[in-house]
From Swiss-Prot:
UniProt similarity note: Belongs to the bacterial ribosomal protein bL35 family.
Record keywords: Ribonucleoprotein, Ribosomal protein
Superkingdom classification of source: Bacteria
UniProt keyword Transcription present: no
Disulfide bonds: none
UniProt-listed NCBIfam families: rpmI_bact (TIGR00001)
Residues that span the membrane, as ranges: none
InterPro entries: Ribosomal_bL35 (IPR001706), Ribosomal_bL35-like (IPR021137), Ribosomal_bL35_CS (IPR018265), Ribosomal_bL35_sf (IPR037229)
Protein name: Large ribosomal subunit protein bL35
HAMAP family attached to this UniProt entry: Ribosomal_bL35
One GO BP annotation of this record: translation
Length: 66
């Protein structure tokens, strides 16, 4: 049976930590920042950890990183 391929789109957007959790950049900071609150901009600055159901979905697309 051939090796499973990793989805390139998922590989570019998600990082797996040493403990197996998935980090992703917070959404909503591409354009239209005038109408966003300062609190929203501040909170979206860093990365966030995906929830368990979302992590399960990402694992299917990155078979060799867990």
């Amino acid at each position: 049976m051939p090796k499973m391929k990793t989805k390139s789109a998922v590989k570019k957007r998600f990082k797996v930590t040493a403990t197996g959790r998935v980090k992703v950049q917070a959404a909503g900071k591409r354009h239209g920042m005038i109408k966003r609150s300062k609190k929203f901009i501040r909170n979206a600055r860093g990365t966030m950890v995906l929830s368990d159901p979302d992590t399960k979905i990402v694992k299917q697309f990155m078979p060799y990183s867990f």
